[in-house]
Amino acid sequence: MKEGIKLEEIIQLLEQNRLAELKEILIKENPIDVAEVFEEFPKERDLIIFKLLPKDFSSEVFSYLSPEKQQEVIENITDEEIKFIMEDMYLDDTVDFIEEMPANIVDKILKNTSHDKRKLINQMLKYPENSAGSVMTVEYISFKDSYTVKQAIDYYRKIAIDKEETDICFVTDNKKKLVGIISLKTLILSNDDSYIKDEMDTNFVSVLTKDDQEETAALFRKYDLTTMPVVDHEDRLVGVITVDDIVDVIDQENTEDIQKMAAMNPSDEEYLKESVMSLAKHRIIWLLVLMISATFTGMVIKKYEEVLQSAVYLAVFIPMLMDTGGNAGSQSATLIIRGIALEEIEFSDILKVIWKELRVSVLVGFILSGINFLRIYYFTKSGFETSLVVAISMFLTIIMAKVIGGVLPLIAKSLKIDPAIMASPLITTIVDTAALIIYFQLSVIFLHI
């Protein structure tokens, strides 16, 4: 929270029963900060704080609480208090909240929600998970294209108090088809007698309810939007997506990508709140896949067993070659995956990527293998031929690893597979196997084993 209030101060005021003073302090704070403090308190005390707050303020605090705390509150407040919270919460926040609750809590919530809002909630819940429809809100302002500016402003003043999106308004025709958008600034600065259809902007970006939320987030980023209309297959306006919800989507998608890049199945749960069994379940499958795929490395070593028996010292350099190759491939893969996510790189750029990674890998490989040659030759006394074999192996491994790391995510994207899957663990497994083959083959050629 802000420096003006501390957790210890709240505890002290509670223990001294100075509730009026505590209330005055809390209502001056941002609801998000109050929600953070609320999360720190045990059940007996947090409900005292919650009931102490004014109803409109407490409902806003409620929307920022974790699902666990929200459930705790709902289980311990009256039906009348639930009704007020539900009516005061924005619809999209209400839907997000309901999706996290068990059936008995959902029944209690819907029982204390107005018929109109309950109908809207049920409608929103029908949209597919991770679709544009699932993250939109219907609390927006729209005008008919036949309105004058004065009529629109009068209408705005009448309904804006209950709407989530008020900076951008939407214009529809008599069939509810979206025909334009108009900002509040444009509305206020326009002549009262002008028609909305003459002042609106017809160059807008919209998405369908079924469109993927990740693609929607990309459009927000590309066009620098704060609000985007959502339409049905007949271009009728059904909702809008606001930037605060898209930020949540971006966070969610980034988290999923990071988890996939670490060879885990994505999870929406917070780490400290997720059970041990759940964490193990999300990790074990990919670990099994990678463990089995790593047997190829063992097969290569077994094939060249005679080479190793003839020159045991070659085994000393295997970990260094494999680790360097894996790291080199991961660097390229990470940059390409990020470029794909930001729509900076497409499959059609694959030749450009290969050419760039080739040049980078030659430069990096030359420097690393040169340093490595000198290090091995002068400090390990392994001899010129051995030092040369290791250096050339490293040079070729880095080139191969960087090209593979750059190409695999693009191939995955073209096959409609998440590029994040083609990340560090998988690329490392492929590179390890190839690096060993290069190393042993060069050893046979140069060392005459």
PLM feature segments, named:
Residues 291-308, 371-382:
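Juxtamembrane "helix exit" motif at the C-terminal ends of alpha-helical transmembrane segments
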Residues 411-431:
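Interfacial loop-to-transmembrane junctions
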Residues 303-317, 380-392:
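Membrane-water interface of transmembrane alpha-helices in multipass transporters/channels
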Residues 245-279, 328-353, 410-414:
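Non-transmembrane, extramembrane segments of multi-pass ion/lipid transporters
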Residues 1-265:
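Hydrophobic packing positions in regular secondary-structure scaffolds
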Residues 338-352, 374-383, 415, 422, ...:
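Juxtamembrane/disordered regions of integral membrane proteins
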Residues 31, 286-294, 317, 321, ...:
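Alpha-helical transmembrane segments in multi-pass membrane proteins
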Residues 273-285, 289, 301, 305, ...:
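Alpha-helical membrane-interface segments at transmembrane helix boundaries
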